[in-house]
Amino acid sequence: MGQKTNPIGNRLGIIRGWDSNWYGGNDYGDKLAEDHKIRKYIHARLSKASVSKVIIERTLKLVTVTITTARPGIIIGKGGQEVDKLKEELKKVTDKEVQINIFEIKRPELDAYLVATSIARQIESRISYRRAIKMAIAASMRMNAEGIKVLISGRLNGAEMARSEGFKEGRIPLSTFRADIDYALAEAHTTYGRMGIKVWIMKGEVYGKRDLSPLAGMDKKQSGTGGGKGGDAPRGKSNFNKGGKPDARKRK
């Protein structure tokens, strides 16, 4: 019944790790609500920075927030000014010392959340949903994805009755636990109402032991409780242009 479950939750502890790492104790509910508040704030504050995951780790007096993004330069800012501002803002949310780490996503076309949000933003810009989805699928397959599936639901083309339409290329073996499948859901807010976009991306199969850290294989751009002052950080290269649309040019 792999089709009925969230592919990420279904693989936790097997080939996927957790995005929140801490011991809750009696304050579990408060910390969980605070994690949700931090993630919601970061995604709203950095909406133009192509943020995917926000990983939160806690000790007694320190909250470590790790942000994975396709455009780290926007978050860091000139001389680390922007990341310092973000750190101070998160301090007010948590009432604790905050450390921010930034990791670059090298291939955003293989990140389900970035693909889903890119499709949603294009639909909001009145681009045909079929065109947006087919461009996203082509971009992912060019980056050597083994398969991708997109399901869109809502009042498509302004139809009177809501319906769903699916697009698929390659293979998505949802019942195979060793299959490395990324999944995400995004919403497009249009004049006809909300549309839901679900994306599954098959990256390959995992054999043997695997590092369950969500950051395995990523490049760290900046870290530290102060966010760092070590000059301008390079802006991450992405196959998504400024409007959030996949760039049709093939990466060399």
From Swiss-Prot:
Superkingdom of the source species: Bacteria
Q: Cross-referenced Pfam families, in alphabetical order?
A: KH_2 (PF07650), Ribosomal_S3_C (PF00189)
**Start and end residues of each stretch annotated as Disordered:** 214-252
Q: Which GO terms describe its molecular function?
A: mRNA binding; rRNA binding; structural constituent of ribosome
User: Per its UniProt record, what CDD domains does this chain match?
Assistant: KH-II_30S_S3
Specify residue ranges for compositional bias: Gly residues. Answer: 224-233
On whether RNA-binding is a keyword of this UniProt record, the answer is yes
The cross-references to InterPro entries, in alphabetical order and at most eight, read: KH_dom, KH_dom-like_a/b, KH_dom_type_2, KH_sf_prok-type, Ribosomal_S3_C_sf, Ribosomal_uS3_bac-typ, Ribosomal_uS3_C, Ribosomal_uS3_CS
Q: Which UniProt keywords apply?
A: Ribonucleoprotein, Ribosomal protein, RNA-binding, rRNA-binding
The segment(s) forming the KH type-2 domain are: 38-106
Q: Which GO terms describe its biological process?
A: translation
Q: Where would one find coiled-coil regions in this protein?
A: none
Q: Which GO terms describe its cellular component?
A: cytosolic small ribosomal subunit
Q: Which NCBIfam families match?
A: rpsC_bact
What protein family does this chain belong to?
Belongs to the universal ribosomal protein uS3 family.
Q: How does it assemble?
A: Part of the 30S ribosomal subunit. Forms a tight complex with proteins S10 and S14.
Q: Per its database record, what is this protein's job?
A: Binds the lower part of the 30S subunit head. Binds mRNA in the 70S ribosome, positioning it for translation.
Q: Which PANTHER family match?
A: 30S/40S RIBOSOMAL PROTEIN S3, SMALL RIBOSOMAL SUBUNIT PROTEIN US3C
The protein in question is named Small ribosomal subunit protein uS3
Name the source organism.
Answer: Flavobacterium johnsoniae (strain ATCC 17061 / DSM 2064 / JCM 8514 / BCRC 14874 / CCUG 350202 / NBRC 14942 / NCIMB 11054 / UW101) (Cytophaga johnsonae)
